[in-house]
Amino acid sequence: MKNLVVVDHPLIKHKLTIMRDKNTGPKEFRELLREITLLLAYEATRHLKCEEVEVETPITKTIGYRINDKDIVVVPILRAGLVMADGILELLPNASVGHIGIYRDPETLQAVEYYAKLPPLNDDKEVFLLDPMLATGVSSIKAIEILKENGAKKITLVALIAAPEGVEAVEKKYEDVKIYVAALDERLNDHGYIIPGLGDAGDRLFRTK
């Protein structure tokens, strides 16, 4: 798992434990997902380049640094990735936002695309793909395929929880994609859910079950 980074931080561990609790309601669940995404983004954006700029303080002129966040694209996988987008956009408010709609067929466990709306992509764009659960990896792989078909070259996948099977599947298909997660869990069960995981993130976010 050479491309995997597990962001080890006390705040993330604390907040993720509350999210795992089956008694945590949707309002708190949404807030925690947004907060953890913000913390993950701190590490996932570490490779971004800064440009020198001159700035005038109340005392004197000096050299500072700015990120050109207009070259950054945030792409949540619908539905559950939407809340993650809110977290990363707090740090990068000028980033472009695309959306990819994918669901996992419960019988075949294959990814089915139902929507894609993306801003212009090219070699210079830094794309952050957001999906809370990296389980089998099929949804993330499908989303990366769509991004690459539309011109994306620099893609970083940010997830809340991953299973080893999902990480290995993404790495096998796309060696150039870095993966940042809050936790690497034990395994998948027979239904493709992460163990111990936190259940279906979308259902818990939007109370659809």
Swiss-Prot record:
Uracil binds at I194, G199, D200, A201. Signal peptide: none annotated. The lineage of its organism: Bacteria, Thermotogati, Thermotogota, Thermotogae, Thermotogales. Pathway: Pyrimidine metabolism; UMP biosynthesis via salvage pathway; UMP from uracil: step 1/1. NCBIfam families: PRK00129.1 (NF001097), upp (TIGR01091). Catalyzes the conversion of uracil and 5-phospho-alpha-D-ribose 1-diphosphate (PRPP) to UMP and diphosphate. One of its GO terms (biological process) is uracil salvage. It catalyses: UMP + diphosphate = 5-phospho-alpha-D-ribose 1-diphosphate + uracil. Allosterically activated by GTP. Gene3D superfamilies: 3.40.50.2020. It comes from Thermotoga maritima (strain ATCC 43589 / DSM 3109 / JCM 10099 / NBRC 100826 / MSB8). Pfam families: UPRTase (PF14681). 5-phospho-alpha-D-ribose 1-diphosphate binds at R79, R104, D131, P132, M133, L134, A135, T136, G137, V138, S139, D200. Belongs to the UPRTase family. Binds 1 Mg(2+) ion per subunit. The magnesium is bound as Mg-PRPP. Its cofactor is Mg(2+). This is Uracil phosphoribosyltransferase. GO terms for molecular function: GTP binding; magnesium ion binding; uracil phosphoribosyltransferase activity. GO terms for cellular component: cytoplasm. Keywords: Allosteric enzyme, Glycosyltransferase, GTP-binding, Magnesium, Nucleotide-binding, Transferase.
